[in-house]
Amino acid sequence: MADGQVAELLLRRLEASDGGLDSAELAAELGMEHQAVVGAVKSLQALGEVIEAELRSTKHWELTAEGEEIAREGSHEARVFRSIPPEGLAQSELMRLPSGKVGFSKAMSNKWIRVDKSAADGPRVFRVVDSMEDEVQRRLQLVRGGQAEKLGEKERSELRKRKLLAEVTLKTYWVSKGSAFSTSISKQETELSPEMISSGSWRDRPFKPYNFLAHGVLPDSGHLHPLLKVRSQFRQIFLEMGFTEMPTDNFIESSFWNFDALFQPQQHPARDQHDTFFLRDPAEALQLPMDYVQRVKRTHSQGGYGSQGYKYNWKLDEARKNLLRTHTTSASARALYRLAQKKPFTPVKYFSIDRVFRNETLDATHLAEFHQIEGVVADHGLTLGHLMGVLREFFTKLGITQLRFKPAYNPYTEPSMEVFSYHQGLKKWVEVGNSGVFRPEMLLPMGLPENVSVIAWGLSLERPTMIKYGINNIRELVGHKVNLQMVYDSPLCRLDAEPRPPPTQEAA
């Protein structure tokens, strides 16, 4: 039946009624889909004050597809019970029945059946009772007959847990006569043509009013992944603080820049194959600044610059090994080395946000590839107090004001600190970053002046993104299992920059 015919039927029924009509009841009387009546109601609403329609919501219980089947044929446990003959049935054969697995466990819990494991041909199932009442089928038949109110809350809850029953919200319209009610519908014009204007016929024709609340068609456009949205926000914070972005295009790095230049010994556990991806081809880096390499070698093996070094036989072959960088601190080392070659020294503030790679076991919170955020400040006479001040400013811009600092160890920073923030949701202090002052054994071989200090800190990009978007499994954020609809629906990233009251104890 066309929409116009349904609308005419609705108007005639409404004219004959005293107060109004319910759209669902009208659909049942006319023997048509409720949605067809709803479409007619909306068409009449568009004509102006012909009708008034009030949206109403009612909840009722409906059987699921499995519930309908059980209401007809009986529950799984009842079917299992009926399938067991007096001499019993092999458990393996029973499990092959369509209702075997579910019905067996339910029938056992109801104590309708038992298992005899001493049978010669394997476990055998026997009836315990002569007959049983299929309460599940009886309850579902009550619901199907419109008597769901006879079931208790506990009974309905059990049926819902078994996915046999569902609570459905039905939206209907209560339709009544409007101020301009009429049973005859005149077609409204939607366009004003030149012919109407020239002939003047527009004066006698009804026009459909503009709907200024209607939504237009959304234009197709690209959508940023949540990780990129948070990355953009972090980048903006660094730029607001006067930082310059470092080049980070060296995904493949030599062990020299990734480890040795950072005063990390060649026997350090982090350089093991269990933690690092080494390259097979090209296996070695051929171009290294050899004068700088010699100074690094001397610092490692003999000491210098006020340090005893590590006192071991430093090997160039080990330093040449290519790898996928394990941190962006290698990019910081390259940037500081370039800075040291410029005379005179100029204070700088650098930052980087890019991918790093670790040979780690994959789980809900760890991937072999992730993003590292790093900030570096180089100036004369910087101290631990400067580092704490910069960290407080940085994290305040992220909306994190409750900070604690804990002493830690890093091969290339001394002193070193872990940064903790109080997580309101978890109700505990969680680590949000690592920081420290670069060691002289790292800076002086580069050629930086002795009175220059470099403070640095870093954190991952994935952790704050997961917290921001309520994601518990990192594989829902990155990888081939990512739901593209999540990327489409995710709102803009707006980090909470509203400062909260400071903690009672700021440092520990």
Swiss-Prot record:
One GO CC term on file: cytosol
Primary location recorded for the protein, binned into one broad class: cytoplasm
InterPro entries: aa-tRNA-synth_II, aa-tRNA-synth_II/BPL/LPL, Phe-tRNA-synth_IIc_asu, Phenylalanyl-tRNA_Synthase, PheRS_DBD1, PheRS_DBD2, PheRS_DBD3, WH_DNA-bd_sf
Species in which this protein is naturally found: Homo sapiens (Human)
GO molecular function: ATP binding; magnesium ion binding; phenylalanine-tRNA ligase activity; RNA binding; tRNA binding
Record annotation: effect of changing residue 410 to K: In RILDBC2; uncertain significance
UniProtKB keywords: Acetylation, Aminoacyl-tRNA synthetase, ATP-binding, Cytoplasm, Disease variant, Ligase, Magnesium, Metal-binding, Nucleotide-binding, Phosphoprotein, Protein biosynthesis
Location of this chain's protein in the cell: Cytoplasm
The enzyme's E.C. designation: 6.1.1.20
Catalytic activity: tRNA(Phe) + L-phenylalanine + ATP = L-phenylalanyl-tRNA(Phe) + AMP + diphosphate + H(+)
Modified residues annotated as Phosphoserine in this record: 193, 301
Name of the protein in its database record: Phenylalanine--tRNA ligase alpha subunit
Residues the entry annotates as binding L-phenylalanine: 329, 372-374, 412, 438
